[in-house]
């Protein structure tokens, strides 16, 4: 009767039932086929019998030393046959292999092995004289050292151990702390060996051993072939990095399978893209797949199968895998695939609850591949290895990777590292998002973004990206790429790009980020050597810039611009302070923004030194505001009446500013309305998937996300500044016909920057939105402005009441004393009033200061009030500001008013609506607000007291709380009659609400205004306290919500 042929899966089940250890399974192959080739290393070959004999001899020596079961044994040998022999010998003796990178210093190796209480190390001739105080056994790879036997002898069988035996301890890289010692069980290796993704290994295969044995993927190189009766072919690092030589070696040795890193594939794409064409299986992993590199490989000569494999050390080699196809290249994204074998993958939210398909969450892995845990680190074990209620798996590993499972096919997409977010100058940044954006410029074959701590005081951290330019790329590729990045990324995510000929790799064949960080520091140091000798005003100023920015600034570079070099608002504030201390002159922040080039700012300083006074606001600026108000005058109003966007056949909303605070809440309210069928959101993003993620994250930030929202969301990648909103002419025209209504909330908001920096997004952006409103069908534009468009008109002009539809020019006199955002709002509103007078279907809403949700307390932790509350709590004091009101209005009330008015198109068009407390008695004075905060702080560790504004400013300068640091110039610069911008808001006028009150008369059941009392303030403070532990942006009053 013929023997039964088992399937691959049946073989695995049989191996699990038999429960034999790895060494015993190898022994079975050696017993059945002793002459089969096991290892090829250059001119040295070992058969299965040879390898058995050498391992058995070394194992006997270990056993004579009374080696305990699972006792750690260090392996310090060069890459090659000795490594294979050493590992096999340790398992023959029932020990645990602890592979060490032989390039590590002795002290590091000693420290790692000491922590494991190791007694023995296996070394080769090259490492036998190192200063390692352990009992050494020498692994000799010379064939003369061993006698040949005719057959494998039964009495040399390895020790009997099970699949639960700890075979290896692999140390993680330890980039931020001591390396973690990860335990690997035999069952984990067996799981991968029998489930090599998509194609099993066959005895005829030759598997490249390319990985350093301290790297867990080397376990595949060694144990996958030996447990399947195949052959290992050792590939040196020198060969691996010479891609043309590697290709020839693969061909000459008949190598069929290789597991390597994404970094090596990227290198091959740049140097010799046909390097892997002879392989049957090529696994890549370790870093996110590079679409550009894969496309190059596919065009030149791909392997038969290219597998994108995923697996942290704690899950042993591979746990997910995806066969890469040309369709992936065309789609621009490569999945990390689906679980292999019996692996279980869960995607969970921060509370550990599984998320629905299509949602982002942390990847948790369960199954046979999961490690028993870290050695001697119980706290990290509790944090990293967890249980999931309702799952058959007892333990899951929290990978720290953020992923998303596709709704369409169940493939899992890698989004980024939970801990690969970095904080640069206060901003939370996903490095993968920066790298992806750089690659999409089409200028580079590879890019690596990283955070570098600058060596100079005050510079803080810098976002740097090293990139490999494509062949044929023009010399100005970097400048071109930066321009493209600025169109799709926030300013703080645009890195300083450094060119490099090829990416350096470390001993694990991954990109060597530490080397790149040091390379940047070295480049900076070389350029900075001669800068300290500069004694001119320009030279001293250049030195100040360099010390603050952490980049070289040659004094001879007339065109150097402080902000184009990457300066943030906080660094601008720091420069103002440094200028005063260095030159003993005062320069306002607005002056810096308007004169940000080195030559112009140096000229201003020289004028100040000579005693020239700064004129606060030129007449030309007033003229510019008036002229900019006419930018849309040439637009022709629609001839047809606007469509009723609330009709069942309509309900298609075009929305800007959806990622902002108010925009997120309005978006959620729109998506909940049954008459709204789709909301197209203009969003800064490199592609729709990224855009959808930004919108989803914006909603989730305030706990607004609901599963059903995704069916109505339409991300439209673009920017306000572009004539066609970044959509292109055809898509622009298509959206103009598609939209039933426009809600325009997108704006740049920065309380320290001038009008010139707000103009592109706010003024020109509104002109572009108006062009969309005029194109296609007639539709209403709902514009959300602010009462700040009047500036400090109560103090400057003496205005006591502001009517809703009154002309804005009468408040122009107050405008120079406010910030650039308020000035841009005045210009936009004046523009819209001119159009409404000509029949344009426009509605304008002017909210007061928008606070958090009145029910949930969810508020913007980065707005002025939140920053003030947190900072005053830290300082223990708040400023007494008489006769000031902020007209606080909760966000849910604001949006309820807007949507109710917007639903009545016929009566709403052509009007302006103030959204402030409905009567003066409900409008809280600023002092009353802060006293409320102080009273809620009583009984805590510190109380908050009111002090004079001057005393508070002195405390502010002394304590410099982080949350107010970017705003200090605004709070301290004296603009008029010795008063600061904030003090000028004394005697705020009453904002008439006649239009709003009339419109709300038809609100079903009436709309009650939520008063800012102690209960509501407590909700806000509690929310801020929870969020204060979360990452904070350096200046959230700085950004464009498009």
UniProtKB/Swiss-Prot annotation:
The modification O-(pantetheine 4'-phosphoryl)serine is found at residue 569. It comes from the Eukaryota. One of its GO terms (molecular function) is phosphopantetheine binding. Residues 29-425 are annotated as: Adenylation (A) domain. Residues 532-609 form the Carrier domain. SMART domains: PKS_PP. GO terms for biological process: biosynthetic process. Residues 655-897 are annotated as: Short-chain dehydrogenase/reductase (R) domain. Its EC number is 1.2.1.101. It catalyses: L-tyrosinal + AMP + diphosphate + NADP(+) = L-tyrosine + ATP + NADPH + H(+). Keywords: Ligase, Multifunctional enzyme, Oxidoreductase, Phosphopantetheine, Phosphoprotein. Induction: Expression is regulated by a complex signaling network which may include cross-pathway interactions mediated by sensing of the cluster final products or shared biosynthetic intermediates. InterPro entries: AA_adenyl_dom (IPR010071), ACP-like_sf (IPR036736), AMP-bd_C_sf (IPR045851), AMP-binding_CS (IPR020845), AMP-dep_synth/lig_dom (IPR000873), Far_NAD-bd (IPR013120), NAD(P)-bd_dom_sf (IPR036291), PKS_PP-bd (IPR020806). Pathway: Secondary metabolite biosynthesis. Pfam families: AMP-binding (PF00501), NAD_binding_4 (PF07993), PP-binding (PF00550). Disruption phenotype: Abolishes the production of piperazines and suppresses the formation of sclerotia when lnbA is also disrupted. NRP synthetases are composed of discrete domains (adenylation (A), thiolation (T) or peptidyl carrier protein (PCP) and condensation (C) domains) which when grouped together are referred to as a single module. Each module is responsible for the recognition (via the A domain) and incorporation of a single amino acid into the growing peptide product. Thus, an NRP synthetase is generally composed of one or more modules and can terminate in a thioesterase domain (TE) that releases the newly synthesized peptide from the enzyme. Non-canonical nonribosomal peptide synthetase; part of the lna gene cluster that mediates the biosynthesis of diastereomeric piperazines. Lna and lnb clusters encode sets of enzymes that produce overlapping sets of previously undescribed metabolites such as piperazinomycin-like metabolites or morpholine. The lna and lnb biosynthetic pathways appear to be part of a signaling network that controls the formation of sclerotia, a resilient overwintering structure. One primary function of the non-canonical nonribosomal peptide synthetases lnaA and lnbA consists in the reduction of L-tyrosine. Belongs to the NRP synthetase family. This is Aldehyde reductase lnaA. It comes from Aspergillus flavus (strain ATCC 200026 / FGSC A1120 / IAM 13836 / NRRL 3357 / JCM 12722 / SRRC 167). The lineage of its organism: Eukaryota, Fungi, Dikarya, Ascomycota, Pezizomycotina. The gene is lnaA.
């Amino acid at each position: 009767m013929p023997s039964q042929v088992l399937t691959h899966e049946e073989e695995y089940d049989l191996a699990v039932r038999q429960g034999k250890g790895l060494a015993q399974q190898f022994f079975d192959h050696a017993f059945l086929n002793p002459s089969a080739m096991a290892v090829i290393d250059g001119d040295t070959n070992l058969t299965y019998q040879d390898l058995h004999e050498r391992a058995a001899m070394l194992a006997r020596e270990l056993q004579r030393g009374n080696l305990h079961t699972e006792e750690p044994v260090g392996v310090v040998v060069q890459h090659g046959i000795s490594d294979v022999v050493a590992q096999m010998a340790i398992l023959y003796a029932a020990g645990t292999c602890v592979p060490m990178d032989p390039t590590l210093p002795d002290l590091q190796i000693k420290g790692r092995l000491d922590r494991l209480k190791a007694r023995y190390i296996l070394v080769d001739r090259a490492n036998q004289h190192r200063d390692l105080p352990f009992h050494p056994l020498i692994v000799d790879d010379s064939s003369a050292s061993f006698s040949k036997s005719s057959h494998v002898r039964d009495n040399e069988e390895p020790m009997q151990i099970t699949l639960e035996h700890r075979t290896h301890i692999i140390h993680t890289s330890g980039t931020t702390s001591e390396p973690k010692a990860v335990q690997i069980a035999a069952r984990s290796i067996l799981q991968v060996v029998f489930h090599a993704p998509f194609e099993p290994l066959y005895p005829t295969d030759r598997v490249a051993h390319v990985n350093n044995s301290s790297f867990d993927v080397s376990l595949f190189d060694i144990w996958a072939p030996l447990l399947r009766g195949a052959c290992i072919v050792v590939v040196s690092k020198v060969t691996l990095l010479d891609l043309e030589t590697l290709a020839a070696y693969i061909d000459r040795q008949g190598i069929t399978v290789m597991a390597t890193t994404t970094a090596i594939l990227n290198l091959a794409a740049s140097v010799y893209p046909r390097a892997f064409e002879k392989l049957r299986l090529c696994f890549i992993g370790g870093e996110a797949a590079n679409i550009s590199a894969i496309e190059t490989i596919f065009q030149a000569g791909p392997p038969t199968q290219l597998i994108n494999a995923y697996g942290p050390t704690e899950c042993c080699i591979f746990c997910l895998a995806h066969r890469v196809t040309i369709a992936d290249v065309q789609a621009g994204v490569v999945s990390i695939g689906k679980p292999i074998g019996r692996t279980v993958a869960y995607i969970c939210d921060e509370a550990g609850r599984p998320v629905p398909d299509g949602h982002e969450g942390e990847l948790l892995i369960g199954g046979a591949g999961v490690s028993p845990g870290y050695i001697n680190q119980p706290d990290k074990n509790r944090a990293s290895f967890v249980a999931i209620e309702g799952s058959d798996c007892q333990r899951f590993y929290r990978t720290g990777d953020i992923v998303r499972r596709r709704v369409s096919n169940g493939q899992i997409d890698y989004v980024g590292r939970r801990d690969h977010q970095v904080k640069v100058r206060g901003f939370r940044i996903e490095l993968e998002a920066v790298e992806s954006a750089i690659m999409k410029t089409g200028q580079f074959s590879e890019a690596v973004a990283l955070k570098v701590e600058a060596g100079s005081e005050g510079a803080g951290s810098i976002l740097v990206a090293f990139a490999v330019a494509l062949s044929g790329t023009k010399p100005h590729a970097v400048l071109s790429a930066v321009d493209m990045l600025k169109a799709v990324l926030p300013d703080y995510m645009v890195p300083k790009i450094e060119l490099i000929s090829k990416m350096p790799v470390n001993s694990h064949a991954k990109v060597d980020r530490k080397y790149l960080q040091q390379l940047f520091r070295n480049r900076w140091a070389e350029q900075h050597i001669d800068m300290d000798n500069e004694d001119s005003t320009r030279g001293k100023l250049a030195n100040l810039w360099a010390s603050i920015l952490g980049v070289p600034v040659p004094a001879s570079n007339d065109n150097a611009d402080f902000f184009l070099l990457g300066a943030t608002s906080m660094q601008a504030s720091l420069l103002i302070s440094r200028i005063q201390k260095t030159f003993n002159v005062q320069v306002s922040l607005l002056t810096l923004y308007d004169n940000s080039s080195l030559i112009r700012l140096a000229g201003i300083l020289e004028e100040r030194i000579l005693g020239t006074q700064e004129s606060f606001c030129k007449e030309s600026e007033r003229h510019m505001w008036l002229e900019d108000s006419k930018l849309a005058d040439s637009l022709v109003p629609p001839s047809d009446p606007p469509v009723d966007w609330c009709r069942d056949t309509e309900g298609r909303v075009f929305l800007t500013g959806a990622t902002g605070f108010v925009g997120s809440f309005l978006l959620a309210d729109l998506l909940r309305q049954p008459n709204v069928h789709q909301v197209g959101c203009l969003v800064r993003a490199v592609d729709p998937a990224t855009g959808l993620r930004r919108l989803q994250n914006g909603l989730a930030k305030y706990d607004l996300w609901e599963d059903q929202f995704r069916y109505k969301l339409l991300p439209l990648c673009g920017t306000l500044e572009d004539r066609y909103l970044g959509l292109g002419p055809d898509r622009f025209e298509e959206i103009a016909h598609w939209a039933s209504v426009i809600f325009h909330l997108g704006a740049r908001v920065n309380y320290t920057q001038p009008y010139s920096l707000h103009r592109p997004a706010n003024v020109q952006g509104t002109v572009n939105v108006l062009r969309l409103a005029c194109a296609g069908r007639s539709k209403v534009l709902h514009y959300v402005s602010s009462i700040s468009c009047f500036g400090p008109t109560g103090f400057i002009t003496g205005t006591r009441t502001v009517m809703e539809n009154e002309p804005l020019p009468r408040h122009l006199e107050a405008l120079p004393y406010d910030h650039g955002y308020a000035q841009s709002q005045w210009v936009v509103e004046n523009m819209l009033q001119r159009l409404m007078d000509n029949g344009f279907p426009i509605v304008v809403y002017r909210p007061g200061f928008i606070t958090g949700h009145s029910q949930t307390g969810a508020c913007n932790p980065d707005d002025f009030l939140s920053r003030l509350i947190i900072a005053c709590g830290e300082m223990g004091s708040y400023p007494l500001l008489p006769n000031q009101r902020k007209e606080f209005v909760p966000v849910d009330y604001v949006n309820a008013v807007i949507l109710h008015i917007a639903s009545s198109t016929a009566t709403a068009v052509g009007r302006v609506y103030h959204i402030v407390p409905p009567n003066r008695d409900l409008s809280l004075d600023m002092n009353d607000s802060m006293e409320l905060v102080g009273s809620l702080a009583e009984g805590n560790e510190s109380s908050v007291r009111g002090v004079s504004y001057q005393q508070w400013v002195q405390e502010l300068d002394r304590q410099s709380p982080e949350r107010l640091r970017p705003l200090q110039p605004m709070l301290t610069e004296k603009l008029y009659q010795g008063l600061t911008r904030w003090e000028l808001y004394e005697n705020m006028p009453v904002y008439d609400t006649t239009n709003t009150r009339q419109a709300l008369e038809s609100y079903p059941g009436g709309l009650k205004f939520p008063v800012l009392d102690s209960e509501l303030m407590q909700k806000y403070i509690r929310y801020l306290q929870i969020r204060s532990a979360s990452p904070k942006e350096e200046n959230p009053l700085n950004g464009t919500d498009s």
